[in-house]
A protein has these predicted regions:
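Flexible hinge/capping segments at coil-to-helix
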Residues: 1-9, 14
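Residue-level preference for short coil/turn positions at secondary-structure junctions
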Residues: 5-6, 49, 82-84
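Residue-level signature of the cytosolic catalytic core of signaling kinases
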Residues: 14, 18, 37, 92-96
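Hydrophobic hinge/microswitch elements
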Residues: 20-74
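C-terminal effector-binding regulatory domain of bacterial HTH transcription factors
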Residues: 28, 60-69, 79-131
Length: 131
């Protein structure tokens, strides 16, 4: 039977956080994969996968519609999904406008609610990995 490592892989460009997460995952699995191409955006990678040019590791947030529409599917693999942390950053000493300060306060006070409302749909994909 066809193995995942037999498929060509589509990568993001060097320096991309998506590529770094993908390479760390592949290395942790001990896989040797064939790189088919490198593209400069998650959208380009997604469209290449939809076109049948290979497979990839992608952020769930970028493929929500395609998963719902059935255009893409997730292959359950132990170790996936890879989780990463994001941070809100700004220039040190920056004076915020009143609107920016209010938005930052909203994010700080409501982050768990915002995350729950916007990203809860992802939870169904976190337990799909094969044993």
């Amino acid at each position: 039977p066809l193995q995942l490592t037999d498929l060509p892989f589509i990568y993001r460009e060097p320096g991309s956080a998506t590529r770094r997460a993908m390479e760390e995952f592949i290395h942790a699995q001990g896989w040797s994969v064939r790189k088919r191409m490198e593209l400069t955006s998650n959208e380009a990678v997604k469209q290449a996968v939809i076109a049948g040019l290979g497979c990839s590791v992608m952020p769930l947030i970028g493929i929500k519609k395609e998963l719902a529409d059935g255009d893409l599917k997730i292959i359950p693999v132990k170790g996936l999904p890879v989780t990463t942390s994001w941070n809100l950053i700004w220039l040190q000493g920056k004076q915020f406008s009143p609107a920016a300060a209010a938005y930052l306060q909203h994010l700080r006070s409501s982050k768990h609610t915002v995350i729950g409302n916007r990203f809860r749909w992802m939870e169904s994909y976190f337990n799909q990995a094969s044993p």
